[in-house]
């Protein structure tokens, strides 16, 4: 949540800078009202952009995808004929960004089929990669929507005027805000926890980029001279790293805004590739910043241990729920049966949504599915919706209960 709040704040500030720039261009017919709307749009998508992340974050995504890749080759091979190629690939390449759209459009249900009732523009801004998993553009498993949301995508394109394979312009801004936030915050967190040998890392970075980024390093060096000498070493380090984060984030924000301005024509006409982010014009520096955390933080004991735990928890939950619920003779009707017990453990809101069968032309419910009529895809999607919506602690607690490691008696 702290990360999302920061992304939301940075995205909003970038929206203001770009909006004020466009206000000065009469041909754009962009006024103060539009600037405020752009800010509100970016603030919203920044806040919800990570809702689809499963337990244990990006590593959790990989665990889900790897589990299904193995399952479809082994026990699940007998069921593969019941799914489309697209559905199979979606499970094998689970992506939290894609789940995000499903959450806000369906899973956060109220009284109709529209989920959180976001505008089409807001949902369009959440689609980082505007193509499906089978598209030739979906390299490295990067895609934007599930087959189950294909009708929604067509409506988004129709209502917003966005063409297939074209990003919403504000998506570039939101993505940059996300990158800027985690680049700065990861370095600060890593240095404070002692994983990053800050003095060494800073010297190496300054040596490599002192000519191209002289003002940035000059500002940091001058600030270091102003730090009170009576501060404890840990406090001095924290102050230096915090200032570095602020300076770097400020630089990257302006870099992204300037890139958006320079390439405004291509962005608005859909000619700028969706995979070309707003920080790519200073790729060497950005990659060097990311490299600091990759080198020192991603292999630290705390991270590795958490990932091992995440692997056991998520794999264990999938091992439990999938074989039981996909069985053709599964009895869902009673909590007295083993499968029934597992089914009743799934959150009621996910089961409610899985049962709805909406009319194609409006939001009315055409019929209610019986559990016995669930397709294989319905069952797998229900399980993934349930598990991916858990927090780390909830997933671990449920795993411990189901394996008998830790029981809660009432």
Q: What feature does the model see in each segment?
A:
Residues 2-10, 14-44, 51-244, 253:
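Sequence-structural signature of the catalytic-core scaffold of metal-dependent phosphohydrolases
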Residues 336-401, 405:
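C-terminal amphipathic alpha-helical interaction region
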Residues 113, 239, 333, 399-410:
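Zn2+-dependent metallopeptidase catalytic domains
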Residues 261-361:
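Substrate-recognition/cap regions that form aromatic- and gly/pro-loop-enriched pockets
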Residues 189, 205, 213-273, 325, ...:
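Polyanionic (Asp/Glu-rich) segments that form extended negatively charged tracts
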Residues 6, 176-179, 248, 252-255, ...:
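Charged, amphipathic alpha-helical oligomerization/scaffolding segments
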Residues 156-161, 233, 289-297, 366-375:
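Short, charged/polar, low-complexity loop and linker segments
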Residues 17, 165-172, 237-248, 277, ...:
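Non-transmembrane, amphipathic alpha-helical segments
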């Amino acid at each position: 949540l702290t990360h999302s709040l920061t992304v939301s704040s940075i995205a909003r500030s970038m929206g203001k800078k770009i909006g004020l720039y466009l206000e000065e261009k009469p041909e754009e017919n962009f006024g103060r009202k539009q600037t405020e709307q752009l800010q509100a749009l970016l603030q919203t998508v920044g806040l919800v952009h990570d809702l689809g992340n499963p337990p244990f974050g990006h590593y959790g995504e990989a665990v889900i995808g790897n589990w299904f890749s193995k399952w479809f080759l082994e026990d699940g091979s007998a069921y593969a004929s019941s799914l489309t190629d697209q559905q199979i690939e979606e499970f094998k390449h689970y992506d939290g960004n894609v789940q995000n759209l499903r959450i806000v459009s369906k899973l956060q249900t109220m009284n109709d089929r529209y989920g959180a009732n976001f505008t089409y523009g807001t949902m369009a801004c959440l689609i980082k990669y505007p193509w499906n998993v089978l598209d030739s553009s979906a390299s490295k498993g990067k895609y934007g929507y599930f087959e189950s949301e294909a009708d929604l995508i067509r409506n988004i394109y129709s209502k917003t005027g966005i063409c297939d394979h074209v990003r919403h312009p504000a998506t570039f801004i939101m993505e940059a805000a996300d990158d800027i936030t985690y680049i700065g915050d990861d370095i600060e967190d890593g240095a404070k926890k002692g994983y990053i040998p800050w003095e060494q890392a800073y010297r190496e970075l300054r040596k490599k980029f002192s000519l191209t980024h002289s003002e940035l390093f000059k500002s940091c060096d001058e600030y270091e001279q102003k730090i009170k000498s009576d501060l404890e070493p840990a406090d001095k380090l924290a102050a230096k790293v915090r200032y570095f984060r602020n300076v770097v984030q400020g630089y990257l924000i302006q870099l992204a805004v300037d890139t958006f301005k320079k390439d405004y024509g291509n962005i608005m006409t859909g000619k700028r590739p969706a995979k070309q982010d707003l920080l790519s014009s200073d790729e060497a520096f950005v990659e060097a910043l990311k490299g600091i955390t990759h080198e020192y933080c991603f292999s630290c004991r705390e991270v590795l241990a958490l990932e091992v735990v995440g692997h056991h928890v998520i794999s264990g939950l999938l091992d439990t729920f999938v074989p039981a619920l996909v069985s053709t003779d599964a009895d869902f009707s009673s909590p007295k049966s083993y499968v029934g017990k597992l089914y009743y453990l799934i959150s009621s809101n996910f089961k409610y949504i899985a049962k709805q069968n909406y009319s194609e032309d409006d939001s009315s419910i055409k019929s209610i599915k019986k559990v016995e009529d669930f397709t294989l895809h319905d069952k797998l999607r229900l399980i993934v919706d349930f598990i991916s919506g858990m927090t780390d602690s909830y997933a671990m607690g449920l795993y411990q209960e189901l394996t008998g490691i830790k029981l809660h008696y009432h």
